[in-house]
Amino acid sequence: NRLTRVMMIVQDMGKQHLLQSLANTDGLTGLLNKRYFDRVLTVLEQHSQPFALFYMDLDRFKPVNDTYGHDVGDKLLKGVAQRLQGCIRSRDYAFRLGGDEFALLLLGPMTQETCARKMDMICEMIAVPYEIDGNAVSVGASCGYALYPAESVDVQQVRCIADQRMYENKQANHARQDGAEGI
């Protein structure tokens, strides 16, 4: 029967779409995953498309897991993912790279000043407490960014620059926290 064959083809297409979606997304947050991140960067580099890469690592995430448990930690990661999705345009990308590490790819040319403002806005947005299971849960974020091709035409170098800036930001955040605890 022709209708049955068409229905089977449509079902197979749906299954293929589902499998592809599962292969490209993080199962917990629904964000795109590291595998897809690597592929997008390769395509952008091959076509010399300008972008800003933001790396983000959560601060104080481990104490949340230790204090409230992994279920609350998972809900927190989902909340962070939702906030990240809310701060990008529809043409941009948000990724969970693993653990409490995230990345954003903002497509098109950008300036250092625009990136610095965006980074500050992301960090402020992530720092707003999350209401999870009746608890106000707070984390911070350390971010770093780099511009392609403005800072390097080598995507690996752009990744290193963003990672180094994130690390420096994390060190500065720890120093501020240590100073605040001493007051």
Regions found by a protein language model. Give the residues of each.
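PAS-family sensory domains
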Residues: R2-D12, I161
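A short pre-motif secondary-structure segment
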Residues: Y93-R96, V137
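Catalytic-core segments of nucleotide cyclases and related cyclic-nucleotide turnover enzymes
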Residues: Q16, A116-C123, A127, E131-D133, ...
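Conserved nucleotide-binding and Mg2+-coordinating catalytic segments in signaling enzymes
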Residues: Q20-R39, M56-H70, K78
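PAS-associated C-terminal cap
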Residues: Q11-S21
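Short regulatory alpha-helical coupling segments
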Residues: Q20-S21, K34-P50, A81-R89
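Hydrophobic framework residues that shape the active-site pocket
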Residues: F61, V80, A94, F102, ...
